[in-house]
Curated annotation (Swiss-Prot):
<feature type="transmembrane region" description="Helical; Name=4">
    <location>
        <begin position="187"/>
        <end position="207"/>
    </location>
</feature>
<comment type="subunit">
    <text>Interacts with Orco. Complexes exist early in the endomembrane system in olfactory sensory neurons (OSNs), coupling these complexes to the conserved ciliary trafficking pathway.</text>
</comment>
<dbReference type="GO" id="GO:0034703">
    <property type="term" value="C:cation channel complex"/>
</dbReference>
<dbReference type="GO" id="GO:0004984">
    <property type="term" value="F:olfactory receptor activity"/>
</dbReference>
<feature type="transmembrane region" description="Helical; Name=2">
    <location>
        <begin position="71"/>
        <end position="90"/>
    </location>
</feature>
<dbReference type="GO" id="GO:0005886">
    <property type="term" value="C:plasma membrane"/>
</dbReference>
<keyword id="KW-0472">Membrane</keyword>
<feature type="transmembrane region" description="Helical; Name=6">
    <location>
        <begin position="306"/>
        <end position="326"/>
    </location>
</feature>
<keyword id="KW-0812">Transmembrane</keyword>
<feature type="topological domain" description="Cytoplasmic">
    <location>
        <begin position="1"/>
        <end position="39"/>
    </location>
</feature>
<feature type="transmembrane region" description="Helical; Name=3">
    <location>
        <begin position="137"/>
        <end position="157"/>
    </location>
</feature>
<dbReference type="GO" id="GO:0007165">
    <property type="term" value="P:signal transduction"/>
</dbReference>
<protein>
    <recommendedName>
        <fullName>Putative odorant receptor 83c</fullName>
    </recommendedName>
</protein>
<keyword id="KW-0552">Olfaction</keyword>
<feature type="transmembrane region" description="Helical; Name=5">
    <location>
        <begin position="283"/>
        <end position="299"/>
    </location>
</feature>
<keyword id="KW-1003">Cell membrane</keyword>
<comment type="similarity">
    <text>Belongs to the insect chemoreceptor superfamily. Heteromeric odorant receptor channel (TC 1.A.69) family. Or67d subfamily.</text>
</comment>
Amino acid sequence: MSTSESPSSRFRELSKYINSLTNLLGVDFLSPKLKFNYRTWTTIFAIANYTGFTVFTILNNGGDWRVGLKASLMTGGLFHGLGKFLTCLLKHQDMRRLVLYSQSIYDEYETRGDSYHRTLNSNIDRLLGIMKIIRNGYVFAFCLMELLPLAMLMYDGTRVTAMQYLIPGLPLENNYCYVVTYMIQTVTMLVQGVGFYSGDLFVFLGLTQILTFADMLQVKVKELNDALEQKAEYRALVRVGASIDGAENRQRLLLDVIRWHQLFTDYCRAINALYYELIATQVLSMALAMMLSFCINLSSFHMPSAIFFVVSAYSMSIYCILGTILEFAYDQVYESICNVTWYELSGEQRKLFGFLLRESQYPHNIQILGVMSLSVRTALQIVKLIYSVSMMMMNRA
């Protein structure tokens, strides 16, 4: 994606790219009306297939609870993927509306000067960097989980599967059955990987616009401060009590800052409402997967679960890290408003500014179940809880 293109064109291309990935799974979130096609039903079949085989393996554990625990290892990933798929199906119109709204902001503001143009472009660059990190992480995890069974088979003949479920009628001791099981699990992992990646992208496409709007608020505050400083300079050159030109422009800039902060607040509220369940499912399901992986490896080392522990921790941490970055953006918004040269405002303008200042003290943070903020601090609390619960389970085992 060339940086010589306009920000709106880059954003439009990025939206289409993410939509092309979700379209592989049968969900076209840019379409005015969601239609089920063969890809949609294939995705539904893959989810049902994985769920059925996992339940079968858990119930047919041969009396060994560890086998059932290993089979349930990737239920966290199941909830994770199911949450994203259902969000696309049930909230398709809201997702589309939010993307088109962001597109309209890019179309409007890219022509308002170099400051806005640079701010919009920097957001696209930031999102592309996040996409690269997510993509590399998932590709590495997929390749590792795919190559591990082959490596162990070639090393000492041990037959393990990337995913811990068994298929009825296909014993792993039989060469043909092992190959069929391996291929079916590979297809399932491909669907899962594309779903995880595309799901993360459309969530991050929405979340990163909070950073963009925060940066644009800084630009607007700078424009207001420049006008107020110019007023102070003019006042030093004229006699006491004389009127100073530019009052209408200063009023317009102040109202522009107030309106933009209201837009910023409304957008944060809309994002929270749209992805409230999805973000909670993402973080908590990955926490569940980490706990199961940790418990399995406490009894004896199990390579697939150890790898999935790293994948789950990675998947949870990218959301929590972005949540912390968003918290810094809220602080940035409040600091920008506090830095307004308020003493150059008129009496009526100060009243308006007072309302703005009070509103900025209560940002709409991204929440997990309305209890915990999405942040690295919450991730550390979850990790401590996982360790405590795992120790308790092992002591009772």
